[in-house]
């Protein structure tokens, strides 16, 4: 009791102390026992599961319905107190009341979870104490009878109220719905427990607590049980559609898809849960899935009748119960209606009006006031409770009610009616009762003023001249009466919105007396009022005629009429909205069926169009439907025309015919051509009144065009692909706006269907072409029989002869036939031919076919595949791992090695993806590897190449599976995924690798080891293979630059060629070395592989150090600044402006200038450790040496590598221009050298300040050289103004750092003739004297060294020397930009000095040649001791036309 009291206090109920009396407790226990006994008797007598509840005479059902006082007073009236708020009985609650002391007066028959329980009360409550729910209305009761207490009118909860409660309280409704299912099973029948009922009632009231408790405490089993119990049973009957669906769902590509871009609707399925359990979307009728709903219809005469809402909830109409009520009326001051109800299983269904179960459902019951219900349609739907609507009171009974009670009773009569015609009939009958009128009419507003649909606003008589004795069926036989807007009395009321009360209708000019003449009825008094909705818009007009007593309608009648019509307006608007929603549901179901039908039939265009035509003719109901397809090439004509006529369905072949007729009838080109051209929709009510219609199509034919609806069919791009035309709607009606909307939707689906069918047909054609192409490809990809015969007759040497077991195997001396014979030896030694019964000639042809399908690329060719197979053979035989893998897997591995790069294009997977190649579209991951595998299968399945033909089915499947895994494992991306688990397992014993998963891992790693096996070979082999790989990579990089306009990665960038040694070291450390060390751990016999990798790594490190050393010795920009400071602070200060101008003039190439002879100059070698610096000094203006002792590094200028590579090309291009521009013939120069600047400037451009700086630098070097050579004689400065200059030199090919010493030596011998020894030692410079017409000469000395930079020594006045050559060969020259700063504006400068005639060599090797010079010694460059002998270092000089010497040094 304490718990019950606390719960009652929690819900606001008053708990009486007298409830604690023992007498009442005993009485309660007796009542419970009686109820249990009655329940047991009912179970024994009633075989069905439908519960029967008998009510005690003292039991009063829970109050429900609208109370009159609730209309007049707000819910917050002090005399009203709130109910418990628990779920009402008909909505799944316990029905247990908590008003006053009623708790001990319960007399409950049976405890069923969710079954309505009546409420017992000792004393009836007064009317103003009737409990109200939260909305101000009393909660619905479990019975449908009506009772009054103190004038209160009580009715049952209607299905509409239950549906509204379901929307407002979805959790409670689902709870009730769940227990309705459980209550009908025998295992859930249990006796009533009062304490359990109280707790359940409290939980019903406190849903927030229930949810919170469920979230915190519910177990997984509880949630699963809840989900199972709430699953929709109808969903199990749904048959999946046969229409194909796209695998990736969205974004479809523009290629091959419909192209439709449907936006994602911002709606969630959770939003539909607020309305309770909805009907299933998909149903099954005759084994065919459909979207049309099954079960009793909701929009026919039963709409608004009993069970109309609950029947369709959940899609499966459950069991119903019908209440039969006997009403007893008592003549008290306030009538009290008590009622006795009992359940009757399997009651009638489908009552359409209050008090009649017949109504619109056709059961025969007249919808009279107080009429009894008919038999209904007799359908029984188990599991659902459905309450029959209460019968309407008779007119005599209504007359006994006061005004407010009467209005309230009539409002209840219409508030739950949702069928428009039935509602209008009830409104007119109730209005006649209220106003005591003889008959009435009701008009509804249709159309809009200047609406987009073209319908004008008017009044349509839904019901006309309705009398109290008329029925809905009689009214349906009447024709509609249309009243123009603003015409007549009704039109005036609709337009003005004001009521009209006319005592004598014939006295009003707006009255139309023709109606009376037709009906024979005399209209006298007339009251007409508008019906408005909640927003104040006029939605209808109601009028009543002639009061029964012959009087006129008074102002009181007007007020009563107006008050009642306010409720009628709300009910009428709800009924219209409900009717529209039902029609919208039906339309959506039809469109969904159409979409399903279209997309499940896409085999041919004929089949798809035939289904569209049949569905459209059935829906629109017209005589003929045509679909005309526009010609793709000629948009002004139709390629195909499909006809369908209504009587085609009645022919004998209708069931077997799957395609429509084509071009049976004449085509109306006028209208269809207009639509096909403009895309406009044409709706013609009378074809002969339209100028576009060609009347000749009806000549000589019994068919006549009347109404035409024509619309364009468009694809997703908005292009017109066809026209759909409907002709002659049935019953001589015109095509309406709704028809246009339907045809528009059909046209959209038809366009998608036609597009998809065209794509399907194109796909079929493409597949046929592919089959033919594959057949042709397999024929040409296979080797000929003659080649196989020839290979078959060749003798195959042993594996020892081929050295196939050697890890240092080299195929450099192998011919192609030798590689094929070596492959045959592998198959023979591994016993594949005998074990798998491989035909030897088929094996020969297969090998020839595999070799034929490798492209002639630089590296990934047949030789690479052969070397990979040899390494796999060596590993299998050396380690005896063939015992682990078995013969089948060994066969797959050898085949995989030979085929793992089939049809390789010389590009990797990344390039295929970047280029969006067809291969990348075909395979998303491991693109090339999948292609290699497909090519392998194609060859294996080609006739004459089926080496696996004699394998069993299981062995063949296993070989293919291992083969695919092996080829895909050659992708480094797959290698990185599997390497981690493999490295963790290398310490396992041999027995560990026998299992399937470790064995597959070992196979994958073995493929990678063999694929990269070139890194384990001796250095000569590795070096050769590395050159091939880098060459192929560079080719791909060039393609990425040219075709894709992207910068390749470093390893494929030809500009980063000299960084390849270091990249190769990184490749070994990150990829190769870990896996080979792991394999050496697995088997000691694989240790040579690791040693080979480490040895090659050392060689690559040596090459990388060479590149690094050369790069580190390049002069930094700070040294350039130091040189500039030396020039500005030293000897250059003594230079006069005239000398500077002379220097600048001499710098300009091909321009005559004056030159002065040099008094004297010395050449010496200045060595410091490994860096050798060369300084050449000469004072520009005097013979006195300068005091500045600073030496300037000759290697002060950095040279761009790309410019160095372009140097030779520049010399060739400009050679002709140099020859044409030169005014003097060259003396001993072997070729003419021209070096245009990067900016395209020539040497005739004005002198720039930087050239002045360069001249100063040359003068400083010469001055420094002069101070160091004290033994040199002074010479006179001479100038020449009439000599021209020319350049000569040869190109030097830049070699890669990957080239070996042998190649470089061979290259040097080729270029230098027999004096190749000079390439490895200090070059000897031979002086040659050249005399000209002038007594003075022009001397040029230009030194240049190139590896990653250039070195230039320039002097205006220097030592005169003759033309020099190295080893008697031509001059070697390479010109690059001089300085990095301002390189885009500075031309390439060639230093010019005077002739060094008569200068002896410092080392005594050479002597004076013409009596004018001093000895000039050879020297070693400062890079000589740090570079390997096989790397090239180049110097070049340029001479003038008088015989200036150019010299180059190659190291």
UniProtKB/Swiss-Prot annotation:
Free-text cofactor note: Binds 2 divalent metal cations per subunit. Site 1 may preferentially bind zinc ions, while site 2 has a preference for magnesium and/or manganese ions.
Domain of life: Eukaryota
InterPro entries found in the cross-reference section: GAF, GAF-like_dom_sf, HD/PDEase_dom, PDEase, PDEase_catalytic_dom, PDEase_catalytic_dom_sf, PDEase_CS
Enzyme Commission designation: 3.1.4.35, 3.1.4.53
Cofactor: a divalent metal cation
Cellular component terms per the entry's GO annotation: cytosol
Cross-referenced Pfam families: GAF, PDEase_I
Region ranges (Disordered): 1-54, 75-100, 125-169, 235-262, 327-374, 1109-1171, 1200-1248, 1268-1305, 1325-1364
Residue numbers binding a divalent metal cation 1: 864, 900-901, 1011
Protein role: Plays a role in signal transduction by regulating the intracellular concentration of cyclic nucleotides cAMP and cGMP. Dual-specificity phosphodiesterase that catalyzes the hydrolysis of both cAMP and cGMP to 5'-AMP and 5'-GMP, respectively.
Protein name, UniProt field: Dual 3',5'-cyclic-AMP and -GMP phosphodiesterase 11
Source organism: Drosophila melanogaster
Gene assigned in the entry: Pde11
